[in-house]
């Protein structure tokens, strides 16, 4: 008799434990279900928080009771020691120290801020202004009071740092003086600027019409159309992705071949030769980057003809390119790699097997070009 009672009590306790485990696993429908389970028509175990809200990290709450959050990270944001704003504000790097100072620093013209820490949805809205950096990398824009000054200075700095040593088209001091004068001038007597802007707008509109009309088969090819496509190629090469500029350059080369600009007998195509009688350009120095740029153009112009001896001719061209080892400008190094690719492409299209020396020179040029790319990327400069 005692054994039967003991076994009965053991069976009852085991049944209760199994029932409780099933309730925790599947949940039971109670009359006092939480708001989340009632709205989603789920089984609720009546706990606070319930099993369903724990599983999916909902804010479990019952009617007439306080809300219970199920996120384990929520307590971090309620802690008094969790402060964002003053610490992060102190870590900012000022981009411009003085808006009236037109002289740039010697170390660097622009200092980008550190990475923006992740902002959680539980953070208070009043600290949002303290979390926002001066520069937002994902949107590529500035959004503070000195935006109109700093953003153009980036491109001015890139131009005079990389492009100006090669081409030397502008006077940096005169340009900075003129920009500062126009910036400080508060008068409205700027009729000359208005005229220039209107003329530029009409010119852009005309070029757009010419480029759009070039898609039609009824439009005859002309030098004007070729010039428009060349300008479009230069613009796309400086502003957009490489494949778009490559398409534009291919179209411009096709138009140049149709018009016959690549032939010496251009008179047969309705054009005439142009004599440059007003050349005032001075001779470039042999030690400067401009002279190295001239040498690159000479190599391109001298080694364009494919003949039976092209294998030895192109070997001489690659050897001349290999001798240009004193190039220090990253932009010129990339141009040198472009010239090597162009010459090697001509050999490939002509089905001429290159010498091993040509391949080794090409690989060495590629290595230097990759180093220049890494250098420009580390300096955040476009090329």
Curated annotation (Swiss-Prot):
Q: What PROSITE patterns has UniProt attached to this entry?
A: ZN2_CY6_FUNGAL_1, ZN2_CY6_FUNGAL_2
Q: What does this protein do?
A: Probable transcriptional repressor of multidrug resistance genes.
Known SUPFAM superfamilies for this protein?
Answer: Zn2/Cys6 DNA-binding domain (SSF57701)
Which GO BP annotation is one of this protein's?
positive regulation of transcription by RNA polymerase II
| UniProt name for this protein | Probable transcriptional repressor C1348.12
Cited SMART domains: GAL4
InterPro entries assigned to the protein according to its UniProt record, in alphabetical order: Metabolite_Synth_Reg, Zn2-C6_fun-type_DNA-bd_sf, Zn2Cys6_DnaBD
Q: Please report the organism this UniProt entry assigns to the protein.
A: Schizosaccharomyces pombe (strain 972 / ATCC 24843) (Fission yeast)
Question: Where's the DNA-binding part?
Answer: 34-60
């Amino acid at each position: 008799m005692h054994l039967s009672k003991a076994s009965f009590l053991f069976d009852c306790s085991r049944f209760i434990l199994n029932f409780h485990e099933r309730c925790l696993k599947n949940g039971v429908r109670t009359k006092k279900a939480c708001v989340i389970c009632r709205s989603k028509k789920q089984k609720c175990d009546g706990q606070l928080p319930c099993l369903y809200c724990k599983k999916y990290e909902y804010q479990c709450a019952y009617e007439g009771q306080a809300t219970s959050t199920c996120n384990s990270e929520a307590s971090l944001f309620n802690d008094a020691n969790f402060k964002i704003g003053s610490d992060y504000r102190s870590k900012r790097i000022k981009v411009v120290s003085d808006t009236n100072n037109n002289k740039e620093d010697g170390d660097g013209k622009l200092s980008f801020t550190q990475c923006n820490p992740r902002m959680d949805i539980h953070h208070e809205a009043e600290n949002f202004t303290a979390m926002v950096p001066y520069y937002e990398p994902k949107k590529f824009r500035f959004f503070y009071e000195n935006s109109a000054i700093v953003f153009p200075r980036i491109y001015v700095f890139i131009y005079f740092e990389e492009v100006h040593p090669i081409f030397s088209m502008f006077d940096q001091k005169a340009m900075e003086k003129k920009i500062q004068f126009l910036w400080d001038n508060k008068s409205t007597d700027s009729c000359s600027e208005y005229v220039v802007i209107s003329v530029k707008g009409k010119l852009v509109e005309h070029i757009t019409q010419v480029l759009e009309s070039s898609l039609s088969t009824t439009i005859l090819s002309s030098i004007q159309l070729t010039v428009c496509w060349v300008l479009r190629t230069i613009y796309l090469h400086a502003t957009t992705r490489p494949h778009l500029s490559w398409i534009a350059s291919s179209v411009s080369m096709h138009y140049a071949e149709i018009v016959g600009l690549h032939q010496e007998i251009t008179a047969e195509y309705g054009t005439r030769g142009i004599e440059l009688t007003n050349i005032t350009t001075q001779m470039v120095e042999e030690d400067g980057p401009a002279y190295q740029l001239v040498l690159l153009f000479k190599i391109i112009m001298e080694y364009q003809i494919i003949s039976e001896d092209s294998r030895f001719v192109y070997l001489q061209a690659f050897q001349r390119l290999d001798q240009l080892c004193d190039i220090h400008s990253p932009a010129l190094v990339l141009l040198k790699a472009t010239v090597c690719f162009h010459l090697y492409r001509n050999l490939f299209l002509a089905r001429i097997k290159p010498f091993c020396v040509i391949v080794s020179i090409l690989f060495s040029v590629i290595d230097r070009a990759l180093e220049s790319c890494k250098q420009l990327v580390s300096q955040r400069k476009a090329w």
